[in-house]
Amino acid sequence: MLDLKLLRDRPEQVRQALQNRRATVDLDGILQLDRERRQLETRKGSLQAESNSLGKKVGEIIRQGADPQGPEVAALRQRGVDLKAEIAQLEQQERELEEEIRARLLTLPNLPLPSVPVGRDEADNVEVRRWGEELKPAHPVLPHDEIAEKLGLLEIGRAVKVAQSRFVAMVGAGAALERALIAMMLERHIAAGYTEVIPPFLVNSAALQGTGQLPKFAEDSFRCADDDLWLIPTAEVPLTNLYRDEMIPAESLPLYFCAYTPCFRREAGSYGRDTKGLIRLHQFQKVELVKVTRPDQSEAEHEKLVQDAEAILQMLELPYRVVELCSGDLGFAAARCFDLEVWFPSQNQYREISSCSNCWDFQARRANLRYKEAGQKGTQFVHTLNGSGLAVGRSLAALLENHQQPDGSIRIPKALRPFLSSRFLSEDGILIPAA
């Protein structure tokens, strides 16, 4: 959530930043509501001061000899009753205005940092670096879904029968391979200082509001309406909200969390895109990284977060590139974001496999997540960061294509082999699909 004081003090700067994001918002409407609220606050303060003085005045005139039951005292007491009623009415109006202002603020996206390149969409994103060589073999590379079905690693038709389209079932060596990827990712991140968490896979509306999925993206989430619970779209939601409405001692920061969870998304608006394979599913597995930091730490921690995600791709020997998102392509809560895109030889293109975002204090304001310096008065909002480390299905898909051999077999990267049962691994590191 944006700081209302920032909107009030620098409206044109905010307006330009939102325009760079291609966000259409009614800033003037929010500022008008804020003016009305402050006018009510001023009026209420004046009435409260008068009410306080009335009590003293009644005592004074009685001490001076006025009849406590007389008309003069009665008039003052009636004025006191009227003031309390008017103050109560103003307080109700003030609460209603505050609720409306907050509701509108919750619809505003985060502001891009000044360093973010200005652009309209993904075509204006800026490539930062590449790692590894793009696989362009002389032999044809089967798409990941075709080679996976051919090797018996996944069931699509039967999963659709059980659920609906955009669901798959990993079986046999496919399930073992996915489990190995998860274990490798978690072990690497834990070794880098992250604390593993197994969070709830269902969260309440307040949690989704805290990280920015609500109210804007309700249609893209699965909801259990009877319980006000939602299936998580990413572990970012429960991890970031672990400390919601809390004050963290400054000496405890930064906090690092990692979690493996299934993730659930309706994929609203993606009709006709990536209808086959593991790229765009309603349910998918992901290892998520979340950091909670002091403001002066967040930019350096952002760079380290990207490197942590890159480390997994390097362990899997997958060629990738790092891209900085332009202002028009930023996610709702991000102030700055780097995407990691992995090479898919069957498509002859890079595809996103991780988004690493610095959300600045945007989520912290929504979730009331603060920290306190020892010996200092007051508290400040933390900065929150998150990134995929990595999306498991897309990692598996990229592995099946980039390590596909001319005979159609799959070479398992050396770093992954210790996590895969020997039943599924030949002596020379080739996947045994039917063990």
From Swiss-Prot:
Pathway: Aminoacyl-tRNA biosynthesis; selenocysteinyl-tRNA(Sec) biosynthesis; L-seryl-tRNA(Sec) from L-serine and tRNA(Sec): step 1/1
Gene Ontology CC: one annotated term: cytoplasm
Summary of subunit composition and partner proteins: Homodimer. The tRNA molecule binds across the dimer.
Protein name per UniProt: Serine--tRNA ligase
Gene Ontology biological process: selenocysteine biosynthetic process; seryl-tRNA aminoacylation
Keyword tags: Aminoacyl-tRNA synthetase, ATP-binding, Cytoplasm, Ligase, Nucleotide-binding, Protein biosynthesis
Protein's job: Catalyzes the attachment of serine to tRNA(Ser). Is also able to aminoacylate tRNA(Sec) with serine, to form the misacylated tRNA L-seryl-tRNA(Sec), which will be further converted into selenocysteinyl-tRNA(Sec).
Record-annotated disulphide pairs: none
EC number annotated for this UniProt entry: 6.1.1.11
UniProt comment concerning the protein's domains: Consists of two distinct domains, a catalytic core and a N-terminal extension that is involved in tRNA binding.
Cellular localisation: Cytoplasm
Sequence positions that bind ATP: 265-267, 352-355
Top EC group: ligase
Catalytic activity: tRNA(Ser) + L-serine + ATP = L-seryl-tRNA(Ser) + AMP + diphosphate + H(+); tRNA(Sec) + L-serine + ATP = L-seryl-tRNA(Sec) + AMP + diphosphate + H(+)
GO MF term set: ATP binding; serine-tRNA ligase activity
Similarity-based family: Belongs to the class-II aminoacyl-tRNA synthetase family. Type-1 seryl-tRNA synthetase subfamily.
InterPro entries, A to Z: aa-tRNA-synt_IIb, aa-tRNA-synth_II, aa-tRNA-synth_II/BPL/LPL, Ser-tRNA-ligase_type_1, Ser-tRNA-synth_1_N, SerRS_1_N_sf, SerRS_core, tRNA-bd_arm
Binding locations of L-serine: 234-236, 288, 388
Domain of life: Bacteria
Pfam families for this protein: Seryl_tRNA_N, tRNA-synt_2b
